[in-house]
């Protein structure tokens, strides 16, 4: 693992080992908060910051932490980072903080974060640990935002309806109304709808992977004409 390239790190985080689509970790906040794009983006960025900060810190102290106590130390680091992020969100994005509620401190229990600290950051130098945290966090955020966009569009007929919660009053104009006089679809906003939407995203990824795998043998089977 020590010779893993940055390209492989990015590919794993965004696609091959995506926390939301492949590992299926952090499903509680993934399904509960992804009702709108803004809520999903807020939680995704908070998770990304946690992954980056905890990965870098774990990599920095990896030579000084005894193996017997590494897990409690990693959890303490993650909890400290999440507490700082929670206080910052309460101060600067208070309305969004009230909506996300308990799911911000619950980031501490996200298995993807402790998993990356244990499996990757504790064995890698700081630059690669940072890259892994960024790739995994942004990959998770992309899934959250895609799920939020799908549920908000089907459930409310809008996109970015609460953009001002994150980007300020100037962002009220960002809201898009996709369907005029749309009465909404309640199922998309409930937990069963979240499971269905996530299942559709996973199915789409599997279809893309299957088609890519079919192309590779076909390309390898093409004979190479001899020169001359």
Curated annotation (Swiss-Prot):
EC number(s) reported in the record: 7.-.-.-
Main location: membrane
Compartments (UniProt record): Cell inner membrane
Heme keyword on record: no
Pfam families, per the entry: Rnf-Nqr (PF02508)
GO biological process terms on file: electron transport chain
Transmembrane segments: 24-44, 73-93, 95-115, 130-150, 184-204
Lineage top rank: taxon: Bacteria
Keyword annotations: Cell inner membrane, Cell membrane, Electron transport, Membrane, Translocase, Transmembrane, Transmembrane helix, Transport
GO cellular component terms, A-Z: plasma membrane
Disulfide bridge map: none
Top-rank EC class of the record's enzyme: translocase
Membrane-related topology note: Multi-pass membrane protein
InterPro entries, A to Z: NqrDE/RnfAE (IPR003667), RnfE (IPR010968)
Subunit note: The complex is composed of six subunits: RnfA, RnfB, RnfC, RnfD, RnfE and RnfG.
Role description: Part of a membrane-bound complex that couples electron transfer with translocation of ions across the membrane.
Family of this protein: Belongs to the NqrDE/RnfAE family.
Protein name: Ion-translocating oxidoreductase complex subunit E
Organism classification: Bacteria, Pseudomonadati, Pseudomonadota, Gammaproteobacteria, Chromatiales
